[in-house]
């Protein structure tokens, strides 16, 4: 949602895919990159790249002008605001916050994983590319 909306605002979007050591991801970084590439294949101004390390290092290496973060709720803001301050201090990057659309404000990967693990239907919660991978896991 946020990436698609950003594609109308910015001339070029670079989506960085990284492993967050504090989260247990269902899919590998490569699988997540592949799904994102499939989801955005028709968007000429969106490029997906995976990386390791700090976001500011990735952004610097790729001449990124600003970091965009999607926010679902105030709890997201608390964490992302701290990260934005750190990114500004470390490398001078500006962070732009964009709220998710209301229909996605409650949604999280943890919620999708839990619903799916109990056999619930997540068709309306994820893109078809993600649903296909979920059903093959």
Which stretches of residues belong to each language-model region?
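Nucleotidyltransferase catalytic core that binds NTPs
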Residues: 1-137
